[in-house]
């Protein structure tokens, strides 16, 4: 079944344009509520959000929609996406709802859902909700309407959960860490997590005004973090995105480390402690150098489709624990049910503290292959798959690279973009091939 509203990470778009409107949010919540009530007499849902100004409007609309379907609501306020996932499970709620467009700018927003177990829901559930949206509403009678309350200590509960994933015998004392929360959902949480574990913390990107989320800060704009680490002679820098489910890190020299590298550090740390790591799941975008390095250490590597939900599905199929994406969505399923930027950063810092090595030293034998990623904006109705010029350009690039590189061309699941990725042993070759493919896509 083709889904009308749900993309790879919930429902997302520009605020005020369908489907990110208050009337749709109310209808959506009502439809979800009806689906929940098919199996539960009195469901409870948790609603968290990031710091976009539109979050207030969408939160109110969702609350009304759920209440009108006979569903109780617990408001969490600004909270990272993984924090909502954790509290949904900890509070024994029926469902978790996150209002966020993750790394997108403030004019965008989105709505995504977590199961009672704190995991992202399968396509089949989203299809059931879309089918319910096509039916006329059935309002609960007055005696059956849902109620709403606020969980005032949601942030504190999540802070303690994050800290519990860091080894009790270790501390961050003596480390100076710059924390960039992207003016997003972790602005009041991330600095406290690292401070309470002993670090000296310098916070940037922690002053949201409703309009500045992800603006020139955070995991998608790490230049500000690099500058702050160098200027303040910090040991590490940690950049989250708007909903804090992804992370990038910087060392004392100002070198940036992406999710592929951080995933390798997490795996290597377990191997160093003689823990069994049978396999790791990456994506079609994961750097070949990481795959080769893991295989040299006897760790199987599998590629899932791009998107942390697909990494999670493959991990569950294989009964493995570790996976992630270069964007910084990292999964350690014995620590959390979903990708968590804060917990991932803590796992990496734990590896550094325990080994006495820097990130650069831990990654000395994993030099990444040059990887070029270009975004080509698609026109409405443009079918890139039937573009013969593009097909020829892709075929030519693959022939040139042979076994020493990769080409991946795919449509974004959240924006009207065609993503072109080329990986090669030489940067100049990767750039040249990627540019040829992007030019061919624009010509179509």
Swiss-Prot record:
Essential cofactor(s): Mg(2+)
GO cellular component: cytosol
Enzyme Commission no: 5.4.2.10
Active-site residues, as the UniProt record annotates them: 102 (phosphoserine intermediate)
Keywords: Isomerase, Magnesium, Metal-binding, Phosphoprotein
Annotated positions binding Mg(2+): 102, 241, 243, 245
InterPro entries xref list: A-D-PHexomutase_a/b/a-I, A-D-PHexomutase_a/b/a-I/II/III, A-D-PHexomutase_a/b/a-II, A-D-PHexomutase_a/b/a-III, A-D-PHexomutase_C, A-D-PHexomutase_C_sf, A-D-PHexomutase_CS, Alpha-D-phosphohexomutase_SF
Modified residues (Phosphoserine): 102
Post-translational modification: Activated by phosphorylation.
Gene3D superfamilies for the chain: Alpha-D-Glucose-1,6-Bisphosphate, subunit A, domain 3 (3.40.120.10), Alpha-D-phosphohexomutase, C-terminal domain (3.30.310.50)
GO terms under biological process: carbohydrate metabolic process; peptidoglycan biosynthetic process; UDP-N-acetylglucosamine biosynthetic process
Reactions this protein catalyses: alpha-D-glucosamine 1-phosphate = D-glucosamine 6-phosphate
Group of enzyme by EC: isomerase
Cofactor note: Binds 1 Mg(2+) ion per subunit.
GO molecular function: magnesium ion binding; phosphoglucosamine mutase activity; phosphomannomutase activity
Pfam families: PGM_PMM_I, PGM_PMM_II, PGM_PMM_III, PGM_PMM_IV
Protein role: Catalyzes the conversion of glucosamine-6-phosphate to glucosamine-1-phosphate.
NCBIfam families: glmM, PRK10887.1
PANTHER family: PHOSPHOGLUCOMUTASE (ALPHA-D-GLUCOSE-1,6-BISPHOSPHATE-DEPENDENT), PHOSPHOHEXOSE MUTASE
Similarity remark: Belongs to the phosphohexose mutase family.
Protein name listed in UniProt: Phosphoglucosamine mutase
Gene behind this protein: glmM
């Amino acid at each position: 079944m083709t889904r009308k509203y749900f993309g790879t990470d919930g429902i997302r778009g520009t605020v005020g344009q369908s489907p990110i409107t208050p009337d749709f949010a109310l209808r959506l919540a009502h439809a979800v509520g009806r689906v929940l009530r098919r199996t539960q007499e009195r469901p409870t849902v948790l609603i968290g959000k990031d710091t976009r100004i539109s979050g207030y409007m969408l939160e109110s609309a969702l609350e009304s929609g759920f209440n009108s379907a006979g569903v109780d609501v617990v408001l969490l306020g600004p909270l990272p996406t993984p924090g909502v996932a954790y509290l949904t499970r900890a509070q024994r709620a029926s469902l978790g709802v996150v209002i966020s467009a993750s790394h997108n700018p403030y004019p965008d927003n989105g709505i995504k859902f977590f199961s009672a177990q704190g995991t992202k829901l399968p396509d089949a559930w989203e299809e059931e909700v879309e089918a319910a949206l096509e039916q006329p509403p059935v309002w609960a009678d007055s005696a059956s309407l849902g109620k709403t309350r606020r969980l005032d200590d949601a942030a504190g509960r999540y802070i303690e959960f994050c800290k519990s994933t860091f080894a009790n015998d270790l501390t961050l004392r003596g480390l100076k860490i710059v924390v960039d929360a992207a003016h997003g959902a972790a602005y009041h949480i991330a600095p406290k997590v690292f401070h309470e574990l002993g670090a000296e913390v310098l916070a940037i990107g922690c002053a949201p005004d409703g309009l500045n989320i992800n603006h020139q800060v955070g995991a998608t704009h790490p230049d500000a973090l690099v500058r702050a680490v160098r200027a303040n002679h910090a040991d590490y820098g940690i950049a989250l995105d708007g909903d804090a489910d992804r992370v990038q890190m910087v060392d004392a020299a100002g070198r940036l480390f992406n999710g592929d590298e951080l995933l390798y550090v997490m795996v290597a740390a377990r191997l160093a402690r003689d823990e069994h790591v049978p396999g790791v799941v990456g994506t079609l975008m994961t750097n070949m150098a990481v795959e080769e390095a893991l295989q040299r250490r006897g760790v199987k590597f599998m590629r899932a489709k791009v998107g942390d939900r697909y990494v999670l599905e493959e991990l569950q199929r294989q009964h493995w624990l570790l996976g992630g994406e270069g964007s910084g969505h990292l999964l350690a399923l014995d620590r959390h049910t979903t990708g968590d930027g804060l917990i991932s950063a803590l796992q990496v810092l734990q590896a550094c503290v325990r080994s006495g090595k820097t990130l650069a030293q831990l990654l000395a034998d994993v030099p990444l292959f040059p990887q070029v990623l270009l975004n080509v904006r698609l026109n409405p109705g443009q079918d890139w798959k039937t573009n013969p010029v593009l097909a020829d350009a892709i075929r030519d690039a693959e022939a040139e690279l042979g076994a020493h590189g990769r080409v991946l061309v795919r449509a974004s699941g959240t924006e009207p973009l065609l993503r072109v990725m080329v990986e090669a042993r030489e940067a100049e070759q990767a750039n040249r091939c990627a540019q040829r493919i992007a030019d061919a896509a624009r010509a179509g």
